[in-house]
UniProtKB/Swiss-Prot annotation:
SMART domains, alphabetized: RPOLA_N
Entry's Gene Ontology cellular component terms: DNA-directed RNA polymerase complex
Residue sites binding Mg(2+) per the record: D462, D464, D466
Subunit composition and interactions: The RNAP catalytic core consists of 2 alpha, 1 beta, 1 beta' and 1 omega subunit. When a sigma factor is associated with the core the holoenzyme is formed, which can initiate transcription.
Residues at which Zn(2+) 1 binds: C71, C73, C86, C89
Binding site for Zn(2+) 2: C811, C885, C892, C895
Name of this chain's protein: DNA-directed RNA polymerase subunit beta'
GO molecular function per UniProt: DNA binding; DNA-directed RNA polymerase activity; magnesium ion binding; zinc ion binding
Pfam families in the record: RNA_pol_Rpb1_1, RNA_pol_Rpb1_2, RNA_pol_Rpb1_3, RNA_pol_Rpb1_4, RNA_pol_Rpb1_5
Keyword annotations of the record: DNA-directed RNA polymerase, Magnesium, Metal-binding, Nucleotidyltransferase, Transcription, Transferase, Zinc
Cofactor field: Mg(2+); Zn(2+)
Entry EC number(s): 2.7.7.6
Coiled coil residues, start to end: none
Amino acid sequence: MNQEVMNLFNPQVPAQNFDSIRISIASPEKILSWSYGEIKKPETINYRTFKPERDGLFCARIFGPIKDYECLCGKYKRMKYKGIICEKCGVEVTLSRVRRERMGHIELAAPVAHIWFLKSLPSRISTLLDMTLKDVERVLYFENYIVTEPGLTALKEHQLLSEEEYMLAVDEYGEDQFTAMIGAEAIYEMLASMNLEKIAGDLRAELADTTSDLKQKKLMKRLKIVENFMESGNRPEWMIMKVVPVIPPDLRPLVPLDGGRFATSDLNDLYRRVINRNNRLKRLIELRAPGIIIRNEKRMLQESVDALFDNGRRGRVITGANKRPLKSLSDMLKGKQGRFRQNLLGKRVDYSGRSVIVTGPELKLHQCGLPKKMALELFKPFIYARLDAKGYSSTVKQAKKLVEKEKPEVWDILDEVIREHPVLLNRAPTLHRLGIQAFEPILVEGKAIQLHPLVCTAFNADFDGDQMAVHVPLSLEAQLEARVLMMSTNNILHPANGAPIIVPSQDMVLGLYYLSILNQNEPGEGMAFSDLGELHHALESKVVTLHTKIRGRFKSVDEDGKPYSKIYETTPGRLLIGELLPKNGKVPFDICNQEMTKKNISKMIDTVYRHCGQKDTVIFCDRIMQLGFAHACRAGISFGKDDMVIPDAKAKIVADTENLVKEYEQQYNDGLITQGEKYNKVVDAWGKATEKVAEEMMARIKAVEFDEKTGRQKPMNSIYMMSHSGARGSPNQMRQLGGMRGLMAKPSGEIIETPIISNFKEGLTVNEYFNSTHGARKGLADTALKTANSGYLTRRLVDVAQDCIVTHVDCGTQTGLTMTAIVDAGQVVASIGARILGRTALDDIDHPVTGERIVDAGKMILEPDVVEIEKAGIQSIRIRSALTCEIQTGVCSVCYGRDLARGTPVNMGEAVGVIAAQSIGEPGTQLTMRTFHLGGTATVVDQSFLEASYEGTVQIKNRNILRNSDGNLVAMGRNMTVQILDERGVERSSQRVAYGSKLHVDEGDKVKRGQRLAEWDPYTRPMMTEVAGTVQFEDLVDGLSVLEATDESTGITKRQVIDWRSTPRGSDLKPAIVIKDASGNIAKLSRGGDARFFLSVDAILSVEPGTKVSQGDVLARSPLESAKTKDITGGLPRVAELFEARRPKDHAIIAEIDGTIRLGRDYKNKRRVIIEPAEDGVEPVEYLIPKGKPFHLQEGDYIEKGDYILDGNPAPHDILAIKGVEALASYLVNEIQEVYRLQGVVINDKHIEVIVRQMLQKVEITDAGDSTYIVGDNVDRIELEDVNDHLIEQGKKPAYGDPVLLGITKASLQTPSFISAASFQETTKVLTEAAIAGKTDGLQGLKENVIVGRLIPAGTGGTMTQIRRIATSRDEMILEERRKGTGAAVATPMLQDMAEKAPAAE
């Protein structure tokens, strides 16, 4: 029997094994070698017989038989004629499957250009020929001739000639004196005659000579393509095709529908057009038709081939019968519906089902309820096998009948089959890895899947009609992985932040909170209980309540495992919770002897997990859930309208604020403040009022009241219980119900000045209702838009990080990042402990006073160490980071630190990149889906003061302080910092003070925690004088540079600087305020410059000419923008902007060196700012700043490297160039974290660091050394290291480069793997580039392996790959030894050697 047939029944035949995939341009010979025959006719199938036409697009002679082992005319049927070619119809007798793999070809009568190389920008053909794309197209589409060989004529090579010019030239020089051609033949000749080596040499020489940047870029582009061709072995003329391949017919099917019509793939239409035009052209050439007709036909052939390869790339889109554009070969690959994303990366699988989910509170954590009907269908093959094994059926048919009849024995067998066979549950959208978990199925009646309540958080599921899908892992390995890695009991911690995710929520929290409440004066107060039995008895007989204050004995074990018992002041309810705690010395009763809010419950579960291990935690979680549900039910907590308390003080607060607002209106009418300032103040006043009302309301709701008759404490307010416990609702929602609704935002994000004074209990007026709908509607619209954006962000993140895998244990690097606590507005938002937990220490950490060792270098910082470090008051710690890891591919385990989802050091082969991407992307969607919960209620708090966050002594760095005429201390320095030192002189905090701030402390003062250090006006920025004297104006011309606005209602004027460059007359002005001394001369500043203060647009003057001013007085104020509400809507685009490394619109200008400011000569409408360097041997740096921009520095100010010359958001590229990688990392991490923090989402820094690492993979060459690189090349970091190693070995000069920051999209498209890049975006461009360079994909990342259908090189797949690699090299060595004839004896010790060296063995 034939081998192929044997293989059918023996699937264990290994697939072809390959290590890499190469892509290159196909030469005409190559295309012919693939082909099984030429297609000569455009016919497809015969419409009567449905048989394919001979030599047509479906020809059976070329592509193979339609039915297995049967030729077309029916002469040979059956297996026995296999391989025979029928002499009548010419069809080979074989499997019809070959119609999916055999290709054909079309011989073109005239060459045509491949549209990818022509039109995919930058055009490869035109770059190579050094012509413009327009010119190349003119030649290709038969508009102009091109001179290929000028001979001795006056014509130039590559000169374009129109028809008339060509005729004139022929008349003038004669036809044989020069060669001019037209069409693809011309381009073919030019490409074929190129001497690539010579061109490359010329280009390099020219590059060395040229100085212009633009020219350099152009030459480099061309040189790159020339070198690509030389290295890959492709020939340039292959970009012009003489033969077109035809893909196998079963990949472009033609299916007869009923009613005599056909459904066909668009490709058949496109191929038909090509064949028709090609045949017509052949006929015209044979007939010797006039040149113009032939030329037209050639142009049409070129267009039809273009449409076949990439429809719509050039000219009109070719449409089918129904005006729909035809799908070309490129469209088959591109986009979400293309081959890559639809069929290779995402496949539909069998053995799956989906149904609605309902809650299953009586399940264990590792179980799910599976409907019987569903299980019967999903496990059918297993049931058939078991029925056969037990002798109930002898054939599959019989088994099928038994199952269909649902005989009782079938149900018994189903029970056996399902036992301990895990199934996977998945809820779409799967935003992180916890969206798919494994459970053991329990058969249930009905048609709904039952889900354990505790895993709802991970799936983000609720029971309002959500559906979930079930998948059955079939092979033993798959079942093993499902059980060991994916079981819900193995996913207790959240991979994003390491906190427990199996945490009770809603009812369970409420029940536990109710249990743990302690009330005064309850019956039985002060009783003592010796054990839990007595307690239960007392509760049953109602001698005590759950909330009575009692003394109870709690029994547990100490740290050595010895049992002990201790008496606590507690309540019966808390003892009931304590009863469930696992017995462990590290888990004391104190963790549940408190009010059990959601936070405390989470901490409790975390403690249990860290000290008692997984099994105990799972059992504990299940019990605590049962307890919570039971008591939530028994407590019977509900709420009515009277639970929403409206505070009595509300009316007074509102009245006071209304008076205040009236006062502001009056001030505005009197011209004391501007419209913008009034707006800010009013918004601020209402914001404060809302807060006050909320505080009053909370105080009322929280208040403990006692019953006069019984003296017992009244039950707590239900709404307060729900909110405070964390079960449902937030103080914000309570405020809207019982306080006042507050300020609302317009859809544009601005805040409406009039707030909503009513709350929902009182009801809104029509006006208020209308205003509130604004915000609510914006919320809903945002939600819809943001979900898509967030999904796209996640996709880009996954794509950039997918090949970041833990590949080694330790890279041994000496570099890392410095971690400090993050302080925002005087509040510590992220403590140093939280940031370093689970990271590896880079240096030894010693106690600053006693000097004793806390953590050794290279060891992980664990929970006890964090406590020690925070006690010791250490401010900054150097840690290892994935960002500075020196492993070439992937990262090492030590740099990454703790695997957050397991709480142990990260395992080899963990796909940390994907986990990072999911951790950052998942909350993006969560948040955006939740925007409307705030109903657009505005929250404006502009910080306007500094508070001491520690106790200690003040020290002021770069001190520059004056006392103004009011006797206040004023900060005059641009980069002053107030530091607080503790009694040991260790710096505890350091905060920048804004210019113009009023200081409450000075050097050497002692401060208490929470004391005000400084304050400033958050709405304007002052300009102050540091010398006393008389004011004089310069260039402040009415109507040109300053506008005197008289307020009509008040008649008071104020002066505001306007944009003076808008008129030609004003273009030379430099508006300024000058201070003159007593003798009438311009006063001198302490630094030696003149006291001349330049003004920016929109500045409001605070002085008149002739005003006497003293030091520290304000001359003018620049208003800052009005406050906008913060909402993740601003957040998500912000995160995307940071990851894409886009330059912000008005980005800050950052000083590159330390030095003093000097103002140079202005340039057009820009101001020239020069920094004179502080140290010698450094060139001064100059910046041009648009004149209207608020520029706050004065001549002579000292500025440090990294300070802002012009305010704004800094461009990440500048931070990288000026301050280096570490500063960039901390900037990106902090900015991204800020967005998430605002929404209360905790993400560990290391995830963001992993992504930033992927963005810093490229290096720009600054010095090429002896390498083949050119200065300005963007090279892979790893590649550069390899090249340099080789250069140094040969004693040559290595190349140097600076790190380049790429946005995530760019970084994804520039991965070494072209398969991964092509499946991401811009498929045609990526494949074109890869083909020209003849790229090889080494299948390193996850995506490319999924696409070619192998196990991913991470996790269990990675281990298999390692083992396979060792085995292969071992076999090679043994064969090598055999060849040498020394036998295999020597190979064994070498083998052990290799196994030790292999990374897997680590």
